[in-house]
Amino acid sequence: MTAMPSFAVVTDGGLDAYPTLLNDVPVAPFSVAFGERSYPMNEVSRQWLYDELGRNPAHPTSSQPSPQQWLDAYAAVPSGTDILAVTISSGLSGSRNAAAQARDLAGRQVTLHDSMTLSAAQAFQVHAANVAAQRGESMETAIAWMNAVQAETELQFTIETLEYLRRGGRIGTVAAALGGLLNLKPVVMVDKKTGTYVNAGRARSYRGGIEAVTSQVTRKYGEGTPLRVGLLYGTHPEDADQALEQLAARHPIVWSDRTGVNPVLSVHVGPRALGVAAAPGAWPWER
Protein backbone atom coordinates (compact mmCIF):
# COMPACT_ATOMS: atom_id res chain seq x y z
CA MET A 1 0.00 0.00 0.00
CA THR A 2 1.40 3.38 -1.02
CA ALA A 3 1.56 6.02 1.71
CA MET A 4 -0.21 9.33 1.27
CA PRO A 5 2.31 12.04 0.30
CA SER A 6 3.34 13.88 3.44
CA PHE A 7 4.17 17.12 1.61
CA ALA A 8 4.58 18.46 -1.94
CA VAL A 9 7.74 19.50 -3.76
CA VAL A 10 8.13 22.57 -5.96
CA THR A 11 11.27 23.89 -7.62
CA ASP A 12 12.55 26.56 -10.00
CA GLY A 13 13.80 26.75 -13.56
CA GLY A 14 17.33 25.84 -12.57
CA LEU A 15 16.11 22.27 -12.93
CA ASP A 16 16.86 20.08 -15.92
CA ALA A 17 14.25 17.34 -15.50
CA TYR A 18 14.57 13.65 -16.37
CA PRO A 19 11.55 11.56 -17.38
CA THR A 20 12.80 8.54 -15.41
CA LEU A 21 13.14 10.51 -12.16
CA LEU A 22 10.38 12.01 -10.01
CA ASN A 23 10.90 15.48 -11.45
CA ASP A 24 7.34 16.39 -12.51
CA VAL A 25 6.63 19.17 -10.01
CA PRO A 26 5.39 22.79 -10.14
CA VAL A 27 8.17 25.05 -11.39
CA ALA A 28 8.78 28.76 -10.84
CA PRO A 29 10.27 29.60 -14.25
CA PHE A 30 13.29 31.68 -15.08
CA SER A 31 12.93 34.00 -18.08
CA VAL A 32 14.97 34.70 -21.20
CA ALA A 33 15.15 38.22 -22.63
CA PHE A 34 16.30 39.45 -26.04
CA GLY A 35 16.46 43.21 -25.73
CA GLU A 36 13.13 44.45 -24.36
CA ARG A 37 11.26 41.19 -24.95
CA SER A 38 11.16 38.71 -22.09
CA TYR A 39 9.91 35.12 -22.32
CA PRO A 40 9.23 32.74 -19.42
CA MET A 41 11.19 29.56 -20.05
CA ASN A 42 8.06 27.43 -19.88
CA GLU A 43 6.73 29.30 -22.92
CA VAL A 44 9.71 28.75 -25.24
CA SER A 45 11.52 25.70 -26.55
CA ARG A 46 15.17 24.87 -26.72
CA GLN A 47 15.03 24.95 -30.51
CA TRP A 48 13.48 28.42 -30.45
CA LEU A 49 16.37 29.66 -28.33
CA TYR A 50 18.99 28.13 -30.62
CA ASP A 51 17.27 29.72 -33.62
CA GLU A 52 17.25 33.10 -31.87
CA LEU A 53 20.91 32.80 -30.95
CA GLY A 54 21.64 32.38 -34.65
CA ARG A 55 19.50 35.22 -35.98
CA ASN A 56 19.03 37.79 -33.20
CA PRO A 57 21.88 40.30 -32.87
CA ALA A 58 20.97 40.99 -29.24
CA HIS A 59 22.63 38.76 -26.67
CA PRO A 60 20.02 37.13 -24.45
CA THR A 61 19.97 37.54 -20.70
CA SER A 62 18.27 35.44 -18.07
CA SER A 63 16.34 36.50 -14.99
CA GLN A 64 15.28 34.66 -11.87
CA PRO A 65 11.67 33.82 -11.02
CA SER A 66 9.71 36.65 -9.47
CA PRO A 67 7.96 36.26 -6.10
CA GLN A 68 4.68 36.08 -8.04
CA GLN A 69 5.96 33.18 -10.12
CA TRP A 70 6.91 31.39 -6.91
CA LEU A 71 3.44 32.15 -5.52
CA ASP A 72 1.95 30.58 -8.65
CA ALA A 73 4.07 27.46 -8.08
CA TYR A 74 2.93 27.26 -4.46
CA ALA A 75 -0.69 27.70 -5.57
CA ALA A 76 -0.37 24.62 -7.79
CA VAL A 77 -0.12 22.54 -4.59
CA PRO A 78 -3.48 21.57 -3.05
CA SER A 79 -4.54 23.73 -0.12
CA GLY A 80 -3.53 22.38 3.25
CA THR A 81 -0.48 20.51 1.93
CA ASP A 82 2.91 21.57 3.27
CA ILE A 83 5.43 22.60 0.62
CA LEU A 84 9.14 21.90 0.21
CA ALA A 85 10.66 24.41 -2.22
CA VAL A 86 13.97 23.27 -3.73
CA THR A 87 15.92 26.14 -5.29
CA ILE A 88 18.89 26.53 -7.58
CA SER A 89 22.07 27.38 -5.68
CA SER A 90 21.89 30.76 -3.97
CA GLY A 91 25.48 31.21 -5.12
CA LEU A 92 24.26 31.34 -8.72
CA SER A 93 20.88 33.06 -8.50
CA GLY A 94 18.60 35.10 -6.27
CA SER A 95 15.75 32.63 -6.84
CA ARG A 96 15.85 31.52 -3.19
CA ASN A 97 15.27 35.11 -2.05
CA ALA A 98 12.23 35.37 -4.32
CA ALA A 99 10.96 32.05 -2.96
CA ALA A 100 11.33 33.39 0.58
CA GLN A 101 9.43 36.58 -0.28
CA ALA A 102 6.65 34.48 -1.79
CA ARG A 103 6.56 32.25 1.29
CA ASP A 104 5.91 35.29 3.47
CA LEU A 105 2.95 36.21 1.25
CA ALA A 106 1.52 32.75 0.65
CA GLY A 107 -0.05 32.02 4.02
CA ARG A 108 1.18 28.43 3.58
CA GLN A 109 3.67 26.22 5.39
CA VAL A 110 6.67 26.43 3.04
CA THR A 111 10.15 25.09 3.81
CA LEU A 112 13.00 26.31 1.62
CA HIS A 113 15.95 24.13 0.64
CA ASP A 114 18.97 25.56 -1.18
CA SER A 115 20.22 22.76 -3.45
CA MET A 116 23.67 24.42 -3.71
CA THR A 117 23.70 23.24 -7.32
CA LEU A 118 21.56 23.29 -10.46
CA SER A 119 20.46 21.41 -13.55
CA ALA A 120 20.90 17.63 -13.45
CA ALA A 121 22.23 17.66 -9.89
CA GLN A 122 19.18 19.67 -8.82
CA ALA A 123 17.05 16.99 -10.51
CA PHE A 124 18.66 14.34 -8.29
CA GLN A 125 17.65 16.30 -5.18
CA VAL A 126 14.10 16.91 -6.39
CA HIS A 127 13.82 13.17 -7.01
CA ALA A 128 15.03 12.42 -3.47
CA ALA A 129 12.49 14.83 -1.98
CA ASN A 130 9.66 13.33 -4.01
CA VAL A 131 10.59 9.78 -2.99
CA ALA A 132 10.43 10.87 0.65
CA ALA A 133 7.07 12.57 0.13
CA GLN A 134 5.55 9.58 -1.66
CA ARG A 135 6.74 7.21 1.07
CA GLY A 136 5.13 9.35 3.74
CA GLU A 137 8.48 10.32 5.23
CA SER A 138 8.98 13.54 7.16
CA MET A 139 10.30 16.69 5.57
CA GLU A 140 13.36 16.35 7.82
CA THR A 141 14.07 12.97 6.21
CA ALA A 142 13.65 14.49 2.75
CA ILE A 143 16.15 17.23 3.56
CA ALA A 144 18.61 14.68 4.97
CA TRP A 145 18.34 12.66 1.77
CA MET A 146 18.82 15.77 -0.37
CA ASN A 147 21.89 16.75 1.65
CA ALA A 148 23.30 13.25 1.18
CA VAL A 149 22.65 13.44 -2.56
CA GLN A 150 24.27 16.88 -2.75
CA ALA A 151 27.36 15.67 -0.91
CA GLU A 152 28.00 12.73 -3.21
CA THR A 153 26.97 14.17 -6.60
CA GLU A 154 29.44 15.83 -8.96
CA LEU A 155 28.18 18.13 -11.73
CA GLN A 156 30.61 19.02 -14.49
CA PHE A 157 30.24 20.39 -18.00
CA THR A 158 32.21 21.51 -21.00
CA ILE A 159 31.26 23.81 -23.87
CA GLU A 160 32.23 24.24 -27.50
CA THR A 161 32.80 28.01 -27.38
CA LEU A 162 33.56 30.58 -24.69
CA GLU A 163 31.64 33.26 -26.61
CA TYR A 164 28.39 32.98 -24.65
CA LEU A 165 30.16 33.10 -21.29
CA ARG A 166 31.98 36.19 -22.55
CA ARG A 167 28.80 37.89 -23.73
CA GLY A 168 27.13 37.16 -20.43
CA GLY A 169 30.00 38.69 -18.47
CA ARG A 170 31.03 35.38 -16.91
CA ILE A 171 34.48 35.38 -18.49
CA GLY A 172 36.74 38.25 -19.51
CA THR A 173 37.19 39.36 -23.11
CA VAL A 174 40.92 38.60 -23.04
CA ALA A 175 40.38 35.14 -21.55
CA ALA A 176 37.72 34.37 -24.15
CA ALA A 177 39.94 35.59 -27.01
CA LEU A 178 42.88 33.56 -25.73
CA GLY A 179 40.72 30.49 -25.26
CA GLY A 180 39.35 30.85 -28.78
CA LEU A 181 42.81 31.33 -30.25
CA LEU A 182 44.15 28.21 -28.55
CA ASN A 183 40.87 26.33 -29.01
CA LEU A 184 40.75 25.69 -25.26
CA LYS A 185 37.55 24.24 -23.86
CA PRO A 186 36.86 24.74 -20.15
CA VAL A 187 35.73 22.02 -17.81
CA VAL A 188 33.54 23.62 -15.17
CA MET A 189 32.14 22.14 -11.98
CA VAL A 190 29.95 23.38 -9.13
CA ASP A 191 31.79 23.84 -5.85
CA LYS A 192 29.94 22.02 -3.07
CA LYS A 193 30.71 24.57 -0.34
CA THR A 194 29.87 27.75 -2.23
CA GLY A 195 27.44 26.48 -4.85
CA THR A 196 29.29 28.48 -7.50
CA TYR A 197 31.10 27.62 -10.73
CA VAL A 198 34.78 26.77 -10.49
CA ASN A 199 37.28 25.84 -13.16
CA ALA A 200 38.09 22.13 -13.07
CA GLY A 201 40.40 21.99 -16.07
CA ARG A 202 40.62 22.61 -19.79
CA ALA A 203 41.04 20.68 -22.99
CA ARG A 204 42.39 21.46 -26.46
CA SER A 205 39.20 20.40 -28.24
CA TYR A 206 35.51 19.95 -27.51
CA ARG A 207 35.87 16.17 -27.82
CA GLY A 208 38.79 16.42 -25.45
CA GLY A 209 36.55 18.37 -23.08
CA ILE A 210 34.05 15.51 -23.02
CA GLU A 211 36.86 13.06 -22.26
CA ALA A 212 38.14 15.39 -19.53
CA VAL A 213 34.70 15.47 -17.89
CA THR A 214 34.31 11.70 -17.86
CA SER A 215 37.91 11.15 -16.76
CA GLN A 216 37.39 13.45 -13.79
CA VAL A 217 34.29 11.48 -12.81
CA THR A 218 36.37 8.30 -12.79
CA ARG A 219 39.13 9.95 -10.76
CA LYS A 220 36.56 11.14 -8.24
CA TYR A 221 34.80 7.82 -7.65
CA GLY A 222 37.42 5.28 -8.73
CA GLU A 223 37.29 2.97 -11.72
CA GLY A 224 34.79 0.15 -11.28
CA THR A 225 32.51 2.07 -8.91
CA PRO A 226 28.83 1.72 -9.92
CA LEU A 227 27.38 5.08 -10.97
CA ARG A 228 24.14 6.91 -11.49
CA VAL A 229 24.60 9.28 -14.42
CA GLY A 230 22.45 12.20 -15.57
CA LEU A 231 23.59 13.47 -18.97
CA LEU A 232 22.94 16.90 -20.50
CA TYR A 233 23.35 18.02 -24.10
CA GLY A 234 22.76 21.08 -26.26
CA THR A 235 22.20 20.79 -30.00
CA HIS A 236 23.93 17.41 -30.30
CA PRO A 237 22.39 14.48 -28.36
CA GLU A 238 25.24 12.29 -29.56
CA ASP A 239 27.56 14.17 -27.19
CA ALA A 240 25.67 12.57 -24.29
CA ASP A 241 25.96 9.17 -25.96
CA GLN A 242 29.72 9.61 -26.26
CA ALA A 243 30.07 10.57 -22.59
CA LEU A 244 27.97 7.62 -21.46
CA GLU A 245 29.99 5.23 -23.62
CA GLN A 246 33.21 6.47 -22.02
CA LEU A 247 31.82 6.11 -18.50
CA ALA A 248 30.30 2.69 -19.19
CA ALA A 249 33.74 1.43 -20.24
CA ARG A 250 35.02 2.19 -16.73
CA HIS A 251 31.96 1.80 -14.47
CA PRO A 252 28.83 -0.31 -14.08
CA ILE A 253 25.99 2.14 -14.83
CA VAL A 254 23.08 1.42 -12.47
CA TRP A 255 20.94 4.28 -13.83
CA SER A 256 21.31 6.77 -16.64
CA ASP A 257 19.15 9.18 -18.57
CA ARG A 258 19.72 12.20 -20.76
CA THR A 259 17.94 15.48 -21.30
CA GLY A 260 18.52 18.71 -23.17
CA VAL A 261 19.88 21.75 -21.36
CA ASN A 262 16.93 24.04 -20.68
CA PRO A 263 16.65 27.36 -22.57
CA VAL A 264 17.72 29.59 -19.68
CA LEU A 265 20.89 27.65 -18.94
CA SER A 266 21.62 27.49 -22.68
CA VAL A 267 21.85 31.29 -22.67
CA HIS A 268 25.10 30.97 -20.73
CA VAL A 269 26.67 27.85 -22.25
CA GLY A 270 25.62 28.28 -25.88
CA PRO A 271 24.14 25.77 -28.32
CA ARG A 272 26.68 22.99 -27.91
CA ALA A 273 27.49 21.74 -24.43
CA LEU A 274 27.85 18.49 -22.54
CA GLY A 275 27.15 18.01 -18.86
CA VAL A 276 27.37 15.07 -16.49
CA ALA A 277 25.89 14.69 -13.02
CA ALA A 278 27.31 11.54 -11.44
CA ALA A 279 26.86 9.84 -8.08
CA PRO A 280 27.93 6.46 -6.74
CA GLY A 281 25.65 3.43 -6.73
CA ALA A 282 22.43 3.35 -4.78
CA TRP A 283 20.27 6.25 -3.62
CA PRO A 284 20.43 7.05 0.13
CA TRP A 285 17.10 5.30 0.85
CA GLU A 286 18.26 2.14 -0.92
CA ARG A 287 21.20 1.54 1.41
Curated annotation (Swiss-Prot):
Q: Which Pfam families does the record match to this protein?
A: DegV (PF02645)
Residues covered by the DegV domain? 7-280
The answer to whether keyword Magnesium applies is no
Q: Where does hexadecanoate bind?
A: S62, S93
The keyword rRNA processing is annotated on this UniProt entry: no
Q: What keywords were assigned to this record?
A: Lipid-binding
Molecular function as annotated in GO = lipid binding
| NCBIfam families documented for this protein | DegV (TIGR00762)
Q: What does this protein do?
A: May bind long-chain fatty acids, such as palmitate, and may play a role in lipid transport or fatty acid metabolism.
**Cited PANTHER family:** DEGV DOMAIN-CONTAINING PROTEIN DR_1986-RELATED, FATTY ACID-BINDING PROTEIN TM_1468
- Name the record gives this protein: DegV domain-containing protein DR_0500
Q: Which species expresses this protein natively?
A: Deinococcus radiodurans (strain ATCC 13939 / DSM 20539 / JCM 16871 / CCUG 27074 / LMG 4051 / NBRC 15346 / NCIMB 9279 / VKM B-1422 / R1)
